[in-house]
């Protein structure tokens, strides 16, 4: 697996380690209207599914998008992908907003679901890299516009880490902190 996506997979596993299905329903105590741990992960899973659809569409056409990034999209790409800053307080687009939880999942189940999506994304990114190279902005993100394969990987990492910080904060607030910090080695 590509080192960027592998790092994300390890960080997800660390963040969810040892949580049972009731613990994944915890929210920030001071902000009970915010998503639960499971809903945060479901948001990420919806994001991965959307990315899979976007990449599959371009791979099926065997042609990159003709879209060009707008000035706001250029700024968003620079801020998020180059600087690694994900803005706080933005409302998620409807297509990646999790529904109310109907089936409780434990941390291990959420980790497995994420690992499956990330493995699929890794295969799609590898295929896109082979077909389009690393610099061609071949597929468009709904907010950031056209991205190249490494930008797609980096987006997933930065977006994921943004939400994993929220999960770790919820765990800490409920005295459920994981034992060790993950290393950022490949």
Task: Specify the residue positions occupied by each region the protein language model found.
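Aromatic-glycine hotspot motif
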Residues: 1-186
């Amino acid at each position: 697996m590509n080192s960027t996506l592998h790092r994300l997979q390890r960080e997800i596993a660390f963040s969810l380690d040892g949580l049972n299905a009731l613990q994944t329903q915890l929210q920030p105590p001071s902000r009970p209207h915010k998503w639960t741990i499971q809903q945060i992960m479901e948001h990420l899973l919806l994001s991965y599914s959307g990315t899979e659809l976007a990449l599959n569409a371009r791979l099926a056409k065997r042609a990159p998008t003709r879209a060009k990034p707008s000035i706001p999209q250029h700024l968003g790409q620079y801020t998020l992908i180059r600087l690694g800053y994900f803005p706080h307080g933005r409302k998620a687009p409807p297509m990646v907003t999790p529904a109310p939880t109907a089936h409780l999942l434990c941390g291990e189940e959420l980790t497995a679901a994420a690992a499956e999506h990330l493995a699929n994304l890794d295969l799609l990114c590898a295929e896109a890299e082979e077909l389009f190279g690393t610099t061609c902005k071949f597929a468009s993100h709904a907010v950031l516009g056209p991205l190249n394969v490494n930008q797609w990987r980096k987006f997933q990492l930065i977006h994921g880490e943004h939400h994993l910080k929220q999960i770790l904060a919820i765990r800490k607030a409920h005295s459920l902190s994981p034992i060790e910090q993950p290393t950022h080695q490949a």
